[in-house]
Amino acid sequence: MGRDGAGCMRRAGVALVVALALGGCVAQETRRDAVEEINRAFRAEYETVLGTRGTRVVAAAHPVVFEAVRATLVQLGMTVRQESPGLGLITADSPAPRPLSPAEWERAAAADLPKARALLARHVGALANLFTFEPEGLSIVINANVLETPGGTEVSFAMRMREVDAPKSDMPRREYPPPTAVAIGIDKLWETLDRELRSRGAAPSRR
């Protein structure tokens, strides 16, 4: 594939880049269908990860837990954009791949890439082998809900992706990080939160 093929490069949301991409090589509708199929599959896995790992309970007062959650996000390099102790909401973001390290992102991408390519191949054939995940041009958004509950405080984390650079094409955007990246990120949030809780004399979170 020559310069024309290289000029076909497209990015689709969370940083789906098809290296010599699909511009004049594959119909726009086909490209859109391919990315939307990946969106559906990864959304299902995303919801499974949050359902099994996203919520825990802390046996401590709400103000203590709220401040520990806030400190957790800051410690992981996130910028707090919105917080309301009354509503129990904290929203923070950071350029991708944080809160993952570059090595963690690469590990997650390697785990999820075979499935993404298999889904893409149904629509674009061998061009799916040029498909990869990259974090550039994206931010990771963490939403934390910190709510009083009988016996303590319930904490829930959600991790989404937002495009911060203007898209270079009209391809559909991906809203979900690779599922393995979500699992790694959520686990990292809990590990950091538990350290913060211990530093405040509170017990760690429990499932």
Q: Which residues does each PLM region occupy?
A:
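Bacterial N-terminal signal peptides that target proteins for export
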Residues: 2-14
